[in-house]
Amino acid sequence: MWQEFKKFAVRGNVIDLAVGVIIGGAFGKIVSSLVNDIIMPLVGLILGGIDFSGLSWKVGEAEVKYGAFLQTVVDFLVIAFSIFLFVKLLNNLHERIKKQEETKQTAPTMTKEQQLLTEIRDLLKQQKETP
């Protein structure tokens, strides 16, 4: 059982996933800071000095914090757009590599007969040109 776990844990996919989760968590914090500390204050300033983090409704004793929800929605949209751009970049790179491989494969290769005939032709041209 321990050997199976070690084999599983050291596989490339699991390590890639772990790295992705760690980077994703750090990226999420960066985006949250971007939204909370830069984007939303600028949007609030444009809309007349509104602080979105403090917007809420009181319903009886409950407090509906729709301002925090709006910030979370903007946070999500920024992350989703960033992921979209990253995936689009990867797809473009993949397509470019695929096209390069296709052009390499479709490049005409000469058979031995064609190579020999080409050499004979070139030799005949040389003999014809020299007196």
From Swiss-Prot:
GO molecular function: mechanosensitive monoatomic ion channel activity
This protein's GO CC annotations: plasma membrane
Residue ranges crossing the lipid bilayer per the database entry: 8-28, 30-50, 67-87
InterPro entries recorded: Mechanosensitive_channel_CS (IPR019823), MS_channel (IPR001185), MSC/AndL (IPR037673), MscL_channel (IPR036019)
SUPFAM superfamilies the record matches: Gated mechanosensitive channel
Domain of life according to the entry: Bacteria
Membrane topology per record: Multi-pass membrane protein
One Pfam family, short name: MscL
Reported function: Channel that opens in response to stretch forces in the membrane lipid bilayer. May participate in the regulation of osmotic pressure changes within the cell.
PANTHER family: LARGE-CONDUCTANCE MECHANOSENSITIVE CHANNEL (PTHR30266:SF2), MECHANOSENSITIVE CHANNEL MSCL (PTHR30266)
Assembly: Homopentamer.
Name under which the protein is recorded: Large-conductance mechanosensitive channel
